[in-house]
Amino acid sequence: MESMINGYEVIEEINKGAFCDSYKVRKGGTNYFLKAYKDPTSMSEDYEQFKQNQRTMIPLLKSIGGQVETIVEDFEVKGLYYQVKEFITGATNLRDWLNDNDNYDERLDVAIQFCEILKAIHGKNIVHQDLKPEQVMVVKDSSKKAGVKIILTDFDWSVPNGNVVRIVGTPGYGNIDGTNLSYKSDIFTFGIILCELLAGVNPFVITEKEEDRIFEPEKWKEWVTEKDYVLPIKINDDLPKSVNDIIVACLEPEQSKRPTLDEIMGVLQGKPAPDRLYPRKKAKLRAPSGDVMIMVPGTGYGRKHFKELFGRTTDTESNPVYKYLDKNYAVLSVVQEGEDILLGCPANGFAKNKIKLNGIEMSSKPTMVKNGDKISIFSTGKGTDIVNFTIEVI
């Protein structure tokens, strides 16, 4: 990079990427953020559409104001395209803010702000297409309930007026709609981020390590349509039911079944989830082999981001269901409240762990359990109990 670009002095390199590099630059005593889009030959005719899309969006984004990044100007030098943006001082990204803040009310306020931003860009006929926490800047603002305001950035692959250049997405936040992009595509990804904001977990990720991902959102539609599998109807016991339900609805594979931003906003502000989002399909129970990961109340066993791993969910009739899951979220066995409460191991057993009921190893035959029964997860490899808990049906 040259020391001067179109009158901007390059101060430091911030990031180098496959498609663009970014720099802190200065002009007239003011600092700016410069993006240099490189290697246009790899895009051929797409590059011209990319530039046209960007130039269409710049005035639209400026008209939205402080909720989105400000693009000061764009220009070309030696065949390469550049954008100059406001340099946001004292900002962190949403990922880092979440890691340092577990206050639900403040996270809820940020979720409401995010919803307002999406309403604003959709109102300008823009689909963002690449939403993720790293694209959201967080700055202090005492006028907000959370004490911060958020600014949505990085509209490189956003779609104005339906003019798609490329289908893109980040692992864990990808697009499941293919070329059928619409505002509801952003709703799906927003649902993932809402789950992180309000439930403390990405529904498609066990840990943040790439190799530990359960499956990508791009495969989600296949899971639902071919395997009749759905997310746990209850994500987190601490979530208000309406918030839980609206998050799950955002992740519907079919666009038409996802809620509108107005419906999401209503729920975040205290209204019940709309009736039209129901009924949902009930997941089929499967019992694959593999290490058991039992959901246990009040522990952080086995997963970094869960407060509790023995999850009380509900079925389509709102009856309590306790599901035992392996590390890939496949259901191994189930405890259902009714006249009898049955607990069973899968017929093929577990690879390394067994379940004990009141000290006796369980077979695949369902056994009635009751409040006060002692459950142990026993490691056959280590010869010790991994975790112990007591059945409590509410």
Which stretches of residues belong to each language-model region?
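Conserved catalytic-loop aspartate of Hanks-type protein kinases
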Residues: 186
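ATP-binding glycine-rich loop module of kinase domains
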Residues: 21, 25-52
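Catalytic-loop of the protein kinase fold
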Residues: 122-139
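Conserved activation segment of eukaryotic-like protein kinases, specifically the C-terminal portion
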Residues: 164-178
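Activation segment signature within eukaryotic-like protein kinase domains
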Residues: 110-111
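Forkhead-associated
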Residues: 293-380
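Short beta-strand micro-motifs within the conserved protein kinase catalytic domain, predominantly
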Residues: 70-81
